[in-house]
Amino acid sequence: MELPKDFLHEIESLLGSDEANALCHALTETEVPTSVRINPLKHPSALPPTESEVPWCETGMYLKERPKFTYDPMFHAGCYYVQEAASMFIEQAYRTITTDFVPQRLLDLCAAPGGKSTLWRSLLPTGTLLVANEPIRQRAQVLAENLTKWGQPDVVCTSAYPEEFAPLGSFFDVIATDVPCSGEGMFRKDEGAVNEWSIQAVDACAARQWDIVQSVWPALREGGYLV
């Protein structure tokens, strides 16, 4: 797979040759093992065969091979969630920002299909509130279904645009914003993502990200964290 020249130039200027080459290798040649995250409240009696633990997530596991999850009742019961290990890294962000305080209200602004929301809810202490939001109504339905299967309490699922949270005024201790990105992580999965990449697309995503963050910013309390 040949990566866009503008992309190669950008990452080399930002990272240097060694790290840029390692990133290119990861995006084009490295096979990604299937990983799952265990639901700490359900303790499944049986899991697909595991290979090793995900180092940055206490409940994350790599599988030896990818099974047909649709045939596994444990999957449908919400005993585990299939999620790329990279997405589990938000656990490290949570542990970093909670060294000096315990968040009482967390907003996951762009939450569908629900992988990160289920992890946020597993990390938050009992009695705290998670608001899992997805602006697109159809995707919000998938989000609600996955949160229901996960089965943990103190979750509100909403379908609102970022600016609709602003009137709450300093309500949330943490706002997690998985804002739209230019999709370099999809290169290994979809060659179409390589063809669609451009500097213009990156700039457009950056502008959209800024608009989203500005819109929701008033809902974050002073001293809170935007992730």
Model features per residue range: what roles?
Residues 1-227:
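S-adenosylmethionine
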